[in-house]
């Protein structure tokens, strides 16, 4: 009885082994066929992020791709435009800026340049950009200190009177 039970178990294990080997081979063929279909699809090309309201914050972008066997050729995706980015260079482009330069007395402007730090979703961005802004009022700390001294002097005079 034990001998028959052992043979039965051995036959069962051999049968399971054969089924497992055949099952993995057919599964590999199906997976390879699926990979071929996926490679027929082109890369996703994304539009710029369009804010839902205003010029920054949450929004959407549209993606398209080509391919005869692609099930999906257009899709929409949520996106976000940070509100602190310089949008004049494109909301998809992030720059690292230098310090502001000295004021140009001829133009009344000061400038600084920025180099491209990051481009989101394969956006086309300029490598370097330049910003200009009007020079602010030049404060003279010595004048402010002298005004304080005058006030202190007047206060002392009032106390003496």
Curated annotation (Swiss-Prot):
Expressed in high levels in brain and eye. Lower levels in bone. In the tailbud embryo stage, it is expressed exclusively in the central nervous system, especially in the hind region of the brain. GO terms for cellular component: extracellular region; extracellular space. GO terms for biological process: defense response to bacterium; positive regulation of cell division; positive regulation of cell population proliferation; response to bacterium. The keyword Signal applies. Disulfide bonds join 41-70, 49-79, 56-83, 93-125, 103-135. Pfam families: PTN_MK_C, PTN_MK_N. It is found in: Secreted. Residues 141-161 are annotated as: Chondroitin sulfate A binding. GO terms for molecular function: chondroitin sulfate binding; growth factor activity; heparin binding. SUPFAM superfamilies: Midkine. Residues 1-23 form the signal peptide. Secreted growth factor that mediates its signal through cell-surface proteoglycan and non-proteoglycan receptors. Binds cell-surface proteoglycan receptor via their chondroitin sulfate (CS) groups. Thereby regulates many processes like cell proliferation, cell survival, cell growth, cell differentiation and cell migration. Has antibacterial activity against both Gram-positive and Gram-negative bacteria. Belongs to the pleiotrophin family. This is Pleiotrophin-A. It comes from Xenopus laevis (African clawed frog).
């Amino acid at each position: 009885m034990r001998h028959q039970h052992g043979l039965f178990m051995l036959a069962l294990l051999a049968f399971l082994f054969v089924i497992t080997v055949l099952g993995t081979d057919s599964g590999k063929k199906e997976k390879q066929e699926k990979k071929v279909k996926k490679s027929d699809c082109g890369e996703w090309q994304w539009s710029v992020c369009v804010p839902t309201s205003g010029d920054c914050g949450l929004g959407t972008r549209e993606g398209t791709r080509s391919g005869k066997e692609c099930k999906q050729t257009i899709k929409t995706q949520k996106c976000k435009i940070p509100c602190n980015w310089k949008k004049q260079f494109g909301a998809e482009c992030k720059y690292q800026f230098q310090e502001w330069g000295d004021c140009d007395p001829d133009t009344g402007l000061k400038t600084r340049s920025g180099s491209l730090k990051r481009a989101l979703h394969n956006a086309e961005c300029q490598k370097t950009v330049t910003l200009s802004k009007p020079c602010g009022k030049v404060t003279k700390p010595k004048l402010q200190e002298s005004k304080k001294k005058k006030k202190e002097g007047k206060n002392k005079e009032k106390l003496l009177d």
